[in-house]
Amino acid sequence: MSQGKIVQIIGAVVDVEFPRESVPKVYDALKVENTEITLEVQQQLGDGVVRCIALGSTDGLKRNLVAVNTGRGISVPVGAGTLGRIMDVLGRPIDEAGPVAASDSWEIHRDAPSYEDQSPATELLETGIKVIDLMCPFAKGGKVGLFGGAGVGKTVNMMELINNIAKAHSGLSVFAGVGERTREGNDFYHEMKDSNVLDKVAMVYGQMNEPPGNRLRVALTGLTMAEYFRDEKDENGKGKDVLLFVDNIYRYTLAGTEVSALLGRMPSAVGYQPTLAEEMGVLQERITSTKNGSITSIQAVYVPADDLTDPSPATTFAHLDSTVTLSRSIASLGIYPAVDPLDSTSRQMDPLVIGHEHYDTAQRVQQTLQKYKELKDIIAILGMDELSEEDKQAVSRARKIERFFSQPFHVAEVFTGSPGKYVSLKDTIRGFKAIVDGEYDHLPEQAFYMVGSIEEAVEKAKKMAEKA
């Protein structure tokens, strides 16, 4: 084990000088003696000096402290011992339940599966959320992004998806909390505990209060744990199907931005690191399904200032199979989940994959909403009376569709007081098909707001009529 000494500390970036014949490799982990701090080598500056990122606070570090090269990259515990536990970026337990009893440890920097090992995803994954199942269906083993600005419901949507999929899905889940609120991580832990699925979830947190090194690497830690479950063959020679939840992928980029300038790189557009696309690619290419097992990932993506063309969300778009875009204008109407059905996309939107009935219904819903969007300006200036009968009918149906896209969530029960609803894909298609066919033109649009299936809307309309 070669030893070096710290020669410079600037924020989260630490320079360490080693003898020239034993300079550590890039991504080697260094341990600072008599401290808990691990450094990860990022650059070799020459003359035996390496520049590192500190995984942990650099408070209390000083020059001439000894750093020991471990000779390998950061390694974290993997396997069944991680289930039900909360760990930090280095795989150390932070739930005060004793050490993690893992059989093996893997390095967090790994190659993506080779081209011939990958397998395409076509099987649909039902979420129980109407707007998602109809307009941007998820694939089992696919990658999904939840895009939204501040406060439009990314985390609540993520929690509902976890509630609906992880609880129904008998496989394993990994949750990586990257630079988000500690409170949300705590809520997630209790949510899993209360629903008795904690023994199927591994949790890795590097939240907002952590130094940038932790936030930069915690996504890789969670991913490595998920990869182990996918790749480790059981007695039948198969890996497992794993769910990977990442909240929030933007903070991973942001942590890279924070240390990029300190590492001596020139900033690129909007001040992001010049290696933005590469860093995103390295992470995203590993989140994939192989012939062995699958990783289905759901990632929340913060959109700075609601600008989807910002380099960070724009770079993320390219890697995803489905994009769920949350809109502030829809949230302002009180329609939750605030998913924009015209802006959300899915690669599964193909009649050969989802079937003709689903595809046709989704297309007709989209056309109706698009027509309403185009007519909004005319309505704002001239009012509804100036529209043709055909246009009035389209507007009426579109407003019903908009309201029918809303749905009470299980995870929001404590706030709203109304019980959550899970709607099967079959019921979702049937309900929307009936609305665009005009079967419910006689019902008031309020009846469609915050209900589950179409039968509930009919029931609600009856109650409204009785009250009136």
Swiss-Prot record:
PROSITE patterns: ATPASE_ALPHA_BETA. CDD domains: ATP-synt_F1_beta_C (cd18110), ATP-synt_F1_beta_N (cd18115), F1-ATPase_beta_CD (cd01133). It is found in: Cell inner membrane. Its EC number is 7.1.2.2. Pfam families: ATP-synt_ab (PF00006), ATP-synt_ab_N (PF02874), ATP-synt_VA_C (PF22919). SMART domains: AAA. It is a peripheral membrane protein. It catalyses: ATP + H2O + 4 H(+)(in) = ADP + phosphate + 5 H(+)(out). Keywords: ATP synthesis, ATP-binding, Cell inner membrane, Cell membrane, CF(1), Hydrogen ion transport, Ion transport, Membrane, Nucleotide-binding, Translocase, Transport. One of its GO terms (cellular component) is proton-transporting ATP synthase complex. It comes from the Bacteria. Its main location: membrane. ATP binds at G148, G149, A150, G151, V152, G153, K154, T155. GO terms for molecular function: ATP binding; ATP hydrolysis activity; proton-transporting ATP synthase activity, rotational mechanism. Produces ATP from ADP in the presence of a proton gradient across the membrane. The catalytic sites are hosted primarily by the beta subunits. Belongs to the ATPase alpha/beta chains family. F-type ATPases have 2 components, CF(1) - the catalytic core - and CF(0) - the membrane proton channel. CF(1) has five subunits: alpha(3), beta(3), gamma(1), delta(1), epsilon(1). CF(0) has three main subunits: a(1), b(2) and c(9-12). The alpha and beta chains form an alternating ring which encloses part of the gamma chain. CF(1) is attached to CF(0) by a central stalk formed by the gamma and epsilon chains, while a peripheral stalk is formed by the delta and b chains. This is ATP synthase subunit beta.
